[in-house]
């Protein structure tokens, strides 16, 4: 039996930082995607709100015109 056989396990330490770095990059990319999607949703919401307000104003003018 070899005395050093089970005493120490070799760990793949050089790969660990690369895997951690890759995971951090993926997390960062995911956060950027979420941030971009959120900004797009807010922009779309603003446009839709403005359009809704324009249509409501048009409707109110139409109702005032027919009421007189």
Swiss-Prot record:
GO terms of biological process kind: axon development; negative regulation of protein ubiquitination; protein secretion; proteolysis; regulation of metallopeptidase activity
A Pfam family assignment: CCDC23
The UniProt record lists the keyword Secreted: yes
Bias-annotated ranges (Basic and acidic residues): 7-25
Keyword terms of this UniProt record: Coiled coil, Cytoplasm, Cytoskeleton, Secreted
Cellular localisation: Cytoplasm; Secreted; Cytoplasm, Cytoskeleton
Keyword Secreted (UniProt): yes
One GO cellular component term noted in the UniProt record for this chain: extracellular region
Coiled coil start-end: 34-54
GO MF annotation terms: microtubule binding
Renumbered residue ranges of the record's region Disordered: 1-34
Main location: cytoplasm
InterPro entries linked to this entry: SVBP
Residue intervals passing through the bilayer: none
Functional description taken from the UniProt entry: Enhances the tyrosine carboxypeptidase activity of vash1 and vash2, thereby promoting the removal of the C-terminal tyrosine residue of alpha-tubulin. Also required to enhance the solubility and secretion of vash1 and vash2. May play a role in axon and excitatory synapse formation.
Family in the record: Belongs to the SVBP family.
Protein name, UniProt field: Small vasohibin-binding protein
Taxonomic source organism: Taeniopygia guttata (Zebra finch)
């Amino acid at each position: 039996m070899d005395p050093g056989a089970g005493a120490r396990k070799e760990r793949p330490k050089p790969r660990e930082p690369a895997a951690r770095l890759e995971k951090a990059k993926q997390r960062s990319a995911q956060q950027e995607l979420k941030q971009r999607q959120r900004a797009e949703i807010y922009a779309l919401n603003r446009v839709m709100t403005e359009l809704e307000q324009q249509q409501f104003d048009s409707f109110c003018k139409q109702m005032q015109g027919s009421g007189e």
